[in-house]
Amino acid sequence: MTYARIQGVGSYIPQQILSNADLEKMVNTTDEWIMQRVGVRERHVIANSPDNTTTMAVDAAKRAIEMAGIDSAVIDMIIVGTATAEYYFPSTACLVQKHLNLREDIPAFDINAACAGFVYALSIADQYIRNGGAKHILVIGVDSLTKVVDWKDRSTCILFGDGAGAVILQAHKEPGILNTILHANGDYSDLITAKSGVWERESVPHLHMYGKEVFKLAVTKLGEIVDEIIEKSGLKQSDIDWLIPHQANLRIIEATAKRLGLPRERVILTIEQHGNTSAASIPLALDAAVRAGKIKRGDTLLLEAFGAGLAWGAALLKL
């Protein structure tokens, strides 16, 4: 049997830091309130730097390729999860292909599942490798949500940061990704929006979110999906070594960890330093944990994410 196994990870965050103290000068909020309600102390932001969605994706990809120890010429697919592409078209994936000078006989495409984008992309890549359609896939989660937040809306501008994370998935005989599950419910599509498109435009496509409703649904749906994927995989909660959640809200993360019976020290947390980086948050956290020596080869990881759509998903894997 062929598995999709993570061979390398990489990430990138902009240099400029926006702290809660900075936000106190911009909107009516406090560091104490943000930490208690969300768990974010600072976030990295593109601001006026040369960074953008494409450049961050490229930098994260380079680091993942380097860790994987592969020649970039063997990459035979690129999938990018993003909701903040630099252009309507071409896709971010094609721009990554260009900047990395990858060969042309490969597919390269974006998928938009908002904050769940990386898990969605990982699931698609897993199916291609299992079915023999590819052997080395570059999967990237990247977003620049600080470019679409309303900096006068204290309920949302405190949440988000920018960044990118990438993995190299390689066909392998040893277990890698064990299972993925993806769900969506468009009936809740109005709960998180950034309305800018061909048919509906805002002069500035500000992000709007009904926070209380999203919080309740996230706790419920993520709790259900982690139970579902563990059962589907024939495992027990005690088999999970690490939870790597989407870094949206510390209270949501704690609710999922409690449901799994995992102590805080077995949960990878970067929300305090990064904020919510949308599709980038899981690969960013994974990269940080691997490079810090926390997560090691053979560990069983549970990834889960929830975002606009509403779309949510989970992945269970052996590193």
UniProtKB/Swiss-Prot annotation:
Under the subunit heading, UniProt states: Homodimer.
Compartmental location: Cytoplasm
The protein's Enzyme Commission number: 2.3.1.180
| Origin: domain of life | Bacteria
Q: What is its main location?
A: cytoplasm
GO terms, biological process: fatty acid biosynthetic process
Name of the protein in its database record: Beta-ketoacyl-[acyl-carrier-protein] synthase III
**What keywords appear on the UniProt entry?**
Acyltransferase, Cytoplasm, Fatty acid biosynthesis, Fatty acid metabolism, Lipid biosynthesis, Lipid metabolism, Multifunctional enzyme, Transferase
* PANTHER family (UniProt xref): 3-OXOACYL-[ACYL-CARRIER-PROTEIN] SYNTHASE (PTHR43091), BETA-KETOACYL-[ACYL-CARRIER-PROTEIN] SYNTHASE III, CHLOROPLASTIC (PTHR43091:SF1)
Q: What is known of its domains?
A: The last Arg residue of the ACP-binding site is essential for the weak association between ACP/AcpP and FabH.
Function, in words = Catalyzes the condensation reaction of fatty acid synthesis by the addition to an acyl acceptor of two carbons from malonyl-ACP. Catalyzes the first condensation reaction which initiates fatty acid synthesis and may therefore play a role in governing the total rate of fatty acid production. Possesses both acetoacetyl-ACP synthase and acetyl transacylase activities. Its substrate specificity determines the biosynthesis of branched-chain and/or straight-chain of fatty acids.
**Pfam families associated with the record:** ACP_syn_III, ACP_syn_III_C
The record's listing under CDD domains reads: KAS_III (cd00830)
Transmembrane region positions? Answer: none
Indicate the family of this protein.
Belongs to the thiolase-like superfamily. FabH family.
Region ACP-binding: start-end pairs: 247-251
Q: Which reaction does it catalyse?
A: malonyl-[ACP] + acetyl-CoA + H(+) = 3-oxobutanoyl-[ACP] + CO2 + CoA
Q: Name one GO molecular function term.
A: beta-ketoacyl-acyl-carrier-protein synthase III activity
Q: Where is the active site?
A: C115, H246, N276
Q: Which gene produces this protein?
A: fabH
Pathway in which this enzyme or protein is active: Lipid metabolism; fatty acid biosynthesis
Provide the species name: Coxiella burnetii (strain CbuK_Q154)
Q: Name one GO cellular component term.
A: cytoplasm
